[in-house]
Amino acid sequence: MTRSPRRPLFAVSLVLSAMLLAGAAHAAVSNEEILQDPKNPQQIVTNGLGVQGQRYSPLDLLNVNNVKELRPVWAFSFGGEKQRGQQAQPLIKDGVMYLTGSYSRVFAVDARTGKKLWQYDARLPDDIRPCCDVINRGVALYGNLVFFGTLDAKLVALNKDTGKVVWSKKVADHKEGYSISAAPMIVNGKLITGVAGGEFGVVGKIQAYNPENGELLWMRPTVEGHMGYVYKDGKAIENGISGGEAGKTWPGDLWKTGGAAPWLGGYYDPETNLILFGTGNPAPWNSHLRPGDNLYSSSRLALNPDDGTIKWHFQSTPHDGWDFDGVNELISFNYKDGGKEVKAAATADRNGFFYVLDRTNGKFIRGFPFVDKITWATGLDKDGRPIYNDASRPGAPGSEAKGSSVFVAPAFLGAKNWMPMAYNKDTGLFYVPSNEWGMDIWNEGIAYKKGAAFLGAGFTIKPLNEDYIGVLRAIDPVSGKEVWRHKNYAPLWGGVLTTKGNLVFTGTPEGFLQAFNAKTGDKVWEFQTGSGVLGSPVTWEMDGEQYVSVVSGWGGAVPLWGGEVAKRVKDFNQGGMLWTFKLPKQLQQTASVKP
């Protein structure tokens, strides 16, 4: 059983906690604290419960034997009519929870009582252009500041104790289609963010800022042919063209509006000192307009955090013609290959394949399907490149209004979309929220216009099965086998948490937060929150007890883009709640995991 070294006696813990809240509530978040986040379950100061994004907690006071007694202790409403999709992961520092809501709002909440301490609402213009709902996925903490991105493509720094604005910087022009929905991150004292907007023909980029004052430090474009920069004393210094030169993998001038937006944010591997980001779809979707691999779209990138230099890349879907993106999280873990331990990273791609890479150099180790139906490719070659099924690429429109339609699986919303998976080092398994669906897709003619949708394609998403779309899967990265699965009627659209207590938590659009036995997949607990659970659950220790929190609120891309699937969820209610749970106190004190 994992117990904190600070907690020799329960009563002492209560006294210390009270002292912390009263006297040390203003303690600054340090870089060392961020790096040690996975080892300090009393706080959560990173998105992903650690800079590597494993979403694993070493706590086991709450475990597979007692989780059936888990009960709500408080709930907090985001209030007002600004509901829509809620996809944030909360952070917790010194008894205060920090999280975001739809429409670029930030809340600070007392983690013991659910009392709101402060709220910040960004003043958004009327012409914001988010592709996939007005969601936000969370904040970053550093020093005495809270950082988040807005739907009009700004970074905002707030005083974490008062919610007052310390600085605000424009990252990109929202009128071109840029926005920010992902949580930024802190790496070696730098504030790192990506951008969204690939559906509008923006040029993706990753940028680093001084968190104290918002000064831009470096910028790295994610489309081949664009110059990267470092900034000193406010002056831009050229730092190499992404990909070396324009036009190598893009025809004509399309690289100028190439998309590849790193819209989901990234993680950091301190062992290699690399930032790991994914990039989105190339623009436009009509692949016949842009023959070639279209780097660095639908790829994973490793960047030097000092200056943004690209150290390696791996492209999961070259010449993407299905909007499969490559943004999904790349989780660092140690992989045993023939008795040799490799510094690896894994990702479950929207295209339906699960990839294991060497995170020191990006080399392909292995890949395999993780969903039941993939039609666009017949497999992967020895380098991890897809073996295309040419009949599944939608046709060129030619002189017609649209080209020939084809049925493709998975659908463009992906075998797995944004919702983060989790890795449990005790079981050696990844827990992947996935979906089984397909689509009819066809290409159309398109010309770029600033701020307008730049797709050149049409589509209708369809379910593949009558009784389920979502599947929570436990996947062994070494064998490539699925260990267990749990089906869900609606598409899964929320993140996953796993713990040393042999538990896996995730939510459903039907409104349930659920817990599963990490080894067997048996459902061992659930709670109805009143609206779809799209957020990423967290767990932490406070006053000698283990808590679980999750955001509830239906929305996101599925009801907006889901075609026939959207009909399945049309009666699901929107919402905006933060739910927090724990065991009754007497069970917390006697908890243990049985062999």
From Swiss-Prot:
Name of protein: Quinoprotein alcohol dehydrogenase PedH
Inducers of expression: Induced in the presence of lanthanides. The underlying regulatory network is responsive to as little as 1 to 10 nM lanthanum, a concentration assumed to be of ecological relevance.
Note in the entry: The soil-dwelling organism P.putida KT2440 produces 2 PQQ-ADHs, namely, PedE, which is Ca(2+)-dependent, and PedH, which is lanthanide-dependent. These enzymes are crucial for efficient bacterial growth with a variety of volatile alcohols. The functional redundancy of the PQQ-ADHs and inverse transcriptional regulation of PedE and PedH represent an adaptive strategy of P.putida KT2440 to optimize growth with volatile alcohols and aldehyde substrates in response to the availability of different lanthanides in the natural environment of the bacterium.
Residues annotated as transmembrane: none
The reaction(s) this protein catalyses: a primary alcohol + 2 Fe(III)-[cytochrome c] = an aldehyde + 2 Fe(II)-[cytochrome c] + 2 H(+); ethanol + 2 Fe(III)-[cytochrome c] = acetaldehyde + 2 Fe(II)-[cytochrome c] + 2 H(+); butan-1-ol + 2 Fe(III)-[cytochrome c] = butanal + 2 Fe(II)-[cytochrome c] + 2 H(+); butan-2-ol + 2 Fe(III)-[cytochrome c] = butan-2-one + 2 Fe(II)-[cytochrome c] + 2 H(+)
Database matches in InterPro entries: ADHI (IPR034119), PQQ_b-propeller_rpt (IPR018391), PQQ_MeOH/EtOH_DH (IPR017512), PQQ_rpt_dom (IPR002372), Quinoprotein_ADH-like_sf (IPR011047), Quinoprotein_DH_CS (IPR001479)
EC number: 1.1.2.-
Residue pairs linked by disulfide bridges in the UniProt entry: 131-132
Primary location recorded for the protein, binned into one broad class: periplasm
Cofactors that this protein relies on: Pr(3+); Nd(3+); La(3+); Ce(3+)
GO cellular component: membrane; outer membrane-bounded periplasmic space
Function: Alcohol dehydrogenase that catalyzes the oxidation of a range of substrates, including linear and aromatic primary and secondary alcohols, as well as aldehydes, but only in the presence of lanthanides, allowing bacterial growth with a variety of volatile organic compounds (VOCs) as carbon and energy sources. Is also involved in the transcriptional regulation of pedE and pedH, most likely acting as a lanthanide sensory module. Uses a specific inducible cytochrome c550, encoded by the adjacent gene in the locus, as electron acceptor.
Keywords: Disulfide bond, Metal-binding, Oxidoreductase, Periplasm, PQQ, Signal
Family statement: Belongs to the bacterial PQQ dehydrogenase family.
Keyword field contains Oxidoreductase: yes
Deleted gene: phenotype: Cells lacking this gene grow efficiently with ethanol, 1-butanol, and 2-phenylethanol in the absence of La(3+), like wild-type strain, and the addition of 20 uM La(3+) to the agar medium restricts the growth of the mutant strain. Cells lacking both pedE and pedH show no growth under both conditions.
Domain of life: Bacteria
Gene Ontology MF, one: calcium ion binding
UniProt: pyrroloquinoline quinone binding residues: 87, 137, 181, 197-198, 263, 350, 417, 493, 557
Entry annotated with the keyword Disulfide bond: yes
Active site feature: 323 (proton acceptor)
Biotech use, per record: Is an attractive biocatalyst for the oxidation of 5-(hydroxymethyl)furoic acid (HMFA) into 5-formylfuroic acid (FFA), a key reaction within the biocatalytic route toward furan-2,5-dicarboxylic acid (FDCA) production. FDCA is a bio-based platform chemical with the potential to replace terephthalic acid in the production of polymers.
Signal peptide: 1-27
PTM comment: The disulfide ring formed between the two adjacent cysteine residues Cys-131 and Cys-132 is essential for efficient electron transfer at pH 7 from PedH to its natural electron acceptor cytochrome c550.
NCBIfam families registered for this protein in UniProt: PQQ_enz_alc_DH
Cell compartments where the protein resides: Periplasm
